[in-house]
């Protein structure tokens, strides 16, 4: 089957990119590919049998028109000016059978005009982390970019140490970022900001294209998508680590996995990025940061969208976020209805977990085993202050009994939203260290496990992290 690529970005937004081809690595080799995703995208298996090929930037497929995008952004709350694809190249936009499209973006593809002081490369460590994280999030049901392939090489890349160079093929319906809009707003080119908005609406919000109120409705949906995404992050204990405006997806996807982390111990102020000295991107600050980023996007639209309309959309953010968050947390607790004491029960559980540094994922998974008419709970053994837990658990059981559903029905609901497995940093690190020694077994094994996060397991993937795996420091270096 021949893959079809179109050139919408290239044709319609000529001032937003530089056309260039990838720079291949030395002795590149394909070490992993996503067969399930490839099948979904109708990619012939033969493409994965011819060496690094397109996955390593050595060849292009017919119809591809590679380019590096330019954008700007606020980093850690400070205007950083022009940024752009410093090591990534958009190879093309695949036209799928249903009429939708999928960007093929090759990360680590070499120097671009936007590399600044960088070398245009990615290392094996970071490409493995992103591949694992994006697939983990996908199977958790959270909107995200996807990983299609990893290529390793003999090319040395210099970071804190010398690491093997690598490339990641990332796919997504669009790589439109808040930073694309900021770039032209701060260059005082509002007509180009409007072109970007029209492009987005035409291709991703086409049902609004002929609406005279399209910009307000479109921005309101961007706000809603962002609020929903952040609510989902918070419910699974995911910290992004570097929520700069240039890392914010217009479509509400999780984008640019760097120093991310899933909660081990429940620590509301968890900081996963060791460069985040002020805690701007701490776990509990993510909802506020996302709103701040949306405000920056709204500012770029103010030359052609009424400020009152923008503010009305921004004002809806909190309610949308709380609605999504509340619904999912009630499901995690096994509540079939909404009762006035629900928030108090959740907050008291969080307080108990924070005091005892309870494991976030294990706590909710074990809570899924609760039988409403039994005072016994396997979760009790996870707490030191048994009296405090017993007091909370007694009130929790009384609340469960109000819903009048069977234990089996409730447990099935809870186990469908409380994962047994998340991508803890130590699991990723173990796969990385093996891969750097040439053993890809753990990389493939972990990828396979992450496809079923809600299934019970009896291996160390669902155990508490070992001592060496706690508080692993992760930086933006990639």
UniProtKB/Swiss-Prot annotation:
Protein's name in the database: Protein nucleotidyltransferase YdiU
The active site of this protein is located at 246
Q: List the disulfide bonds.
A: none
Give the binding site residues for Mg(2+). Answer: 247, 256
The free-text function statement in the UniProt record for this protein reads:
Nucleotidyltransferase involved in the post-translational modification of proteins. It can catalyze the addition of adenosine monophosphate (AMP) or uridine monophosphate (UMP) to a protein, resulting in modifications known as AMPylation and UMPylation.
Cofactor requirement: Mg(2+); Mn(2+)
Record's InterPro entries? Answer: adnlytase_SelO, SelO
Transmembrane region positions? none
Q: Which reaction does it catalyse?
A: L-seryl-[protein] + ATP = 3-O-(5'-adenylyl)-L-seryl-[protein] + diphosphate; L-threonyl-[protein] + ATP = 3-O-(5'-adenylyl)-L-threonyl-[protein] + diphosphate; L-tyrosyl-[protein] + ATP = O-(5'-adenylyl)-L-tyrosyl-[protein] + diphosphate; L-histidyl-[protein] + UTP = N(tele)-(5'-uridylyl)-L-histidyl-[protein] + diphosphate
Q: What would be an example GO MF term here?
A: magnesium ion binding
The gene from which this protein is expressed is: ydiU
Q: What is its EC number?
A: 2.7.7.-, 2.7.7.108
Q: Which family does it belong to?
A: Belongs to the SELO family.
Pfam families named in the record: SelO
The UniProt keywords, alphabetically, are: ATP-binding, Magnesium, Manganese, Metal-binding, Nucleotide-binding, Nucleotidyltransferase, Transferase
What PANTHER family has UniProt attached to this entry?
Answer: PROTEIN ADENYLYLTRANSFERASE SELO, MITOCHONDRIAL
UniProt binding sites for ATP: 84, 86-87, 107, 119-120, 170, 177, 256
Source organism lineage?
Bacteria, Pseudomonadati, Pseudomonadota, Gammaproteobacteria, Enterobacterales
Name the domain of life this protein comes from: Bacteria
């Amino acid at each position: 089957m021949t893959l079809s690529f179109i050139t919408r970005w290239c044709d319609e937004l000529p001032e937003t990119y530089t056309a260039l081809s990838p720079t291949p690595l030395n002795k590149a080799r394909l070490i992993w590919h996503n067969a399930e995703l490839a099948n979904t995208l109708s990619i012939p298996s033969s493409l994965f049998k011819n060496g690094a090929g397109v996955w390593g930037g050595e060849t292009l497929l017919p119809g591809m028109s590679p380019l590096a995008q330019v954008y700007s952004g606020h980093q850690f709350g400070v205007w950083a000016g022009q940024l752009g694809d410093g090591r990534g190249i958009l190879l093309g936009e695949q036209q799928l059978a249903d009429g939708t499209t999928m960007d093929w973006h090759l990360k680590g593809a070499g120097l671009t005009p936007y590399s600044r002081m960088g070398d245009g490369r990615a290392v094996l460590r970071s490409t493995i982390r992103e591949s694992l994280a994006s697939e983990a999030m996908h199977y958790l049901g959270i909107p995200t970019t996807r990983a299609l392939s990893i290529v390793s090489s003999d090319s040395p890349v210099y970071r804190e140490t010398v690491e093997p160079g690598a490339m990641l093929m990332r796919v997504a319906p669009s790589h439109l970022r808040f930073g694309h809009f900021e770039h032209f707003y701060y260059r005082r080119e509002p007509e180009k900001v409007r072109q970007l908005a029209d492009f987005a609406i035409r291709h991703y919000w086409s049902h609004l294209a002929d609406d005279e109120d399209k910009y307000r409705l479109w921005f309101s949906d961007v706000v809603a998508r962002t609020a929903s995404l952040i609510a989902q992050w918070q419910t699974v204990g995911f910290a992004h680590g570097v929520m700069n405006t240039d890392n914010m997806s217009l479509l509400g996807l999780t984008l640019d996995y760097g120093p991310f982390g899933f909660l081990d111990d429940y620590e509301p102020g968890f900081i996963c990025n060791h460069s985040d000295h002020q805690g701007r991107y701490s776990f509990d600050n993510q909802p506020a940061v996302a709103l701040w980023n949306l405000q920056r996007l709204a500012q770029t639209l103010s030359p052609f969208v009424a400020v009152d309309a923008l503010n009305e959309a921004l004002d809806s953010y909190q309610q949308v976020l709380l609605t999504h968050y509340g619904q999912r947390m009630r499901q995690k607790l096994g509540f079939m209805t909404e009762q006035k004491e629900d928030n108090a029960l959740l907050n008291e559980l969080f307080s108990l977990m924070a005091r005892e540094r309870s494991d976030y994922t294990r706590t909710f998974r074990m809570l899924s085993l609760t039988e409403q008419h039994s005072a016994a709970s396997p979760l009790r053994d996870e707490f030191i202050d048994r009296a405090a837990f017993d007091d909370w658990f007694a009130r929790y059981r009384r609340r469960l009994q109000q819903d009048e559903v069977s234990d089996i029905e409730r447990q099935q609901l809870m186990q469908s939203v409380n994962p047994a497995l998340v991508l803890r940093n130590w699991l990723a690190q173990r796969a990385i260290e093996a891969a750097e020694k040439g053993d890809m077994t753990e990389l493939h094994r972990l990828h396979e496990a992450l496809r079923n996060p809600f299934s019970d397991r009896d291996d160390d993937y669902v155990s508490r992290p070992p001592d060496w795996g706690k508080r692993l420091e992760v930086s933006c270096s990639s």
